From Swiss-Prot:
A Pfam family matched in the record: SelA
EC nos: 2.9.1.1
Keyword Cytoplasm: yes
Gene Ontology CC entries for this record: cytoplasm
PANTHER family associated with the record: L-SERYL-TRNA(SEC) SELENIUM TRANSFERASE
Protein's cellular compartments: Cytoplasm
Family: Belongs to the SelA family.
GO process terms (BP): conversion of seryl-tRNAsec to selenocys-tRNAsec; selenocysteine incorporation
InterPro entries named in the record: PyrdxlP-dep_Trfase (IPR015424), PyrdxlP-dep_Trfase_major (IPR015421), SelA-like (IPR018319), SelA_trans (IPR004534), SelA_trans_N_dom (IPR025862)
Cofactor: pyridoxal 5'-phosphate
A single GO molecular function term of this UniProt record: L-seryl-tRNA(Sec) selenium transferase activity
Protein's recorded name: L-seryl-tRNA(Sec) selenium transferase
Sites bearing N6-(pyridoxal phosphate)lysine, chain numbering: K292
Species for this entry: Geobacter sulfurreducens (strain ATCC 51573 / DSM 12127 / PCA)
């Protein structure tokens, strides 16, 4: 009897107790499709010569069906364990929210809210009022506005302040970020006319002054957060641009990308200016993201002088890019943590990960490994290694953060197979392969990730 002939038929699988329980909880077509998928996998393994006798046991086959049902009924967008060591991982949703912020979002989502209702006056209010005062308090700006992402913030500002006019920007600041988002394209879409000055590596104050004409509407500075130009370089600083703008009667705008509200240099993380620095030197409009170094939800934040922010609130484009209530709840909750810097550093996950010391990471790795060892079979072996993490999110492209890595080895499973199978689990576990081993970075592992990793490794080793 060949191994193909021992693969069970559909009817026999449907009669198994575990599969009957699945039929009681799920539509029959869903379970039937899972059975056929499991059988296809068994036949493929038989053809490859990797199918084992124990894989054909009733419990093993039913387990496959159960996992396939779980996979097919799971939401497409779901929680993932980030073991990559990239803190602001764009593909994994960037910044996780603080626990109390998650609770605020849940409370707002549960029922109705005062999104656009003034509870004091009993009349229509503005959704932006929930965060404007907070943003002004935290940044020192006169006015603030929020939209759904920073690209939209830049587009809105350019459309409202420089539509049909020239915008002067250094050639070395014409950046492209992920998803082919390019500053020149956004300027064109906003109706602004790009006027490049300087060279890729050197731009001077005189370049801006010489480029100004009667058609000039705005001076733009773009922070090159996702790349670095080193060597023979020169750039015009924000204070210098403000001086030029005041001299020539032109507004100055800065797109600073990540938008950090806390100076992280004391933690060895240098090179990213704070929002407050740009506001304090007189930049008229500053735009930045909510889900990068700020550690909140995806949002585009605009702060600056009232004379230039208020026109944005009346622009027709704002309606198309306005922020929704759940994002607004998450953003307000995150911003409130920043009223106490110590609280923000302790509770905002992104900040907590970025500022973790080497000793904290070693301890975190030891504790995580201890929990894993209690839950996985002996065929799973764990070891700690020194390594480096990355900030991610287009910030600090040259910075490497020392970290502790957890190396995972499973008998009979190659690192490549492990990586592929772990990211297909009910709760996907995403790590990286380096030095011929599958690695999880302690910096980006959350405390409650352990049960999901244990479950995944147990299934992998079975």
């Amino acid at each position: 009897m060949t191994i193909f002939s021992r693969i069970p038929k559909v009817d026999r699988i449907l009669e198994q107790d575990e599969v009957r329980r699945l039929l009681a909880d799920h539509p029959r077509p869903t379970v039937l499709a899972a059975v056929r998928t499991a059988l296809d996998a068994l036949r493929a393994e038989a053809r490859a010569g990797s199918l084992r006798e124990q894989d054909l046991a009733d419990g093993a086959v039913a387990g496959r069906v159960g996992r396939e049902v779980a996979r097919s009924t799971a939401c497409s967008l779901r929680r993932v364990v980030n073991g990559t060591g990239v803190v602001i991982h764009t593909n994994l949703g960037r910044s996780p929210l603080a626990e109390r912020v998650r609770q605020r979002v849940d409370d707002t989502a549960y029922g109705y809210s005062n999104l656009e209702f003034d509870l004091e006056r009993g009349e229509r209010g503005s959704r932006y009022s929930h965060v404007e005062k907070l943003l002004c308090e935290l940044t020192g700006a006169e006015a603030a506005l929020v939209v759904n992402n920073n690209a939209a913030a830049v587009l809105l500002a350019l459309s409202a302040l420089a539509g049909g006019k020239e915008v002067i920007v250094s050639r070395g600041e014409l950046v492209e970020i992920g998803g082919s988002f390019r500053i020149p394209d956004v300027m064109q879409q906003g109706g602004a006319v790009l006027r490049e000055v300087g060279t890729t590596n050197r731009t001077h104050s005189r370049d801006y002054r010489q480029a100004v004409t009667s058609e000039t509407g705005l001076l733009l500075k773009v922070h090159s957060s996702n790349f670095a130009v080193v060597g023979f370089t020169a750039e015009v600083t924000a204070p210098e641009m403000v001086a030029i703008g005041r001299e020539l009667g032109l507004p100055v705008m800065a797109d600073i990308g990540s938008g950090c509200l806390i100076d992280l240099s004391r933690f060895g993380i240098r090179g990213e200016p704070t929002v407050q620095e740009f506001v304090s030197v007189g930049v008229d409009v500053v735009t930045f993201s909510g889900d990068k170094l700020l550690g909140g939800p995806q949002a585009g934040i605009i702060v600056g002088r009232k004379a230039y922010v208020d026109p944005l609130k009346k622009h027709p484009l704002l309606r198309a890019i306005r922020i929704d209530k759940l994002t607004l709840a998450a953003l307000e909750g995150t911003l409130r943590l920043y009223r106490d810097e110590r609280q923000a550093l302790a509770e905002v996950p992104t900040l907590r990960m970025l500022t973790a010391s080497a000793e904290e990471l070693r301890l975190r790795a030891r504790q995580f490994m201890r929990r894993l060892r209690r839950g996985v079979p002996s065929s799973v072996r764990l070891a700690s290694l020194d390594g480096v993490s990355q900030v991610g999110g287009g910030a600090y492209p040259l910075l490497e953060l020392p970290t502790t890595l957890i190396a995972v080895d499973v008998d009979g499973v190659s690192p490549q197979e492990m990586e592929a199978r772990l990211r297909r689990m009910t709760v996907p576990v995403v790590g990286r392969i380096n030095r011929g081993r599958f690695l999880l970075d302690a910096r980006t592992l959350l405390d409650d990730d352990a049960p999901a990793v244990i479950s995944a490794l147990r299934e992998l080793a079975s």
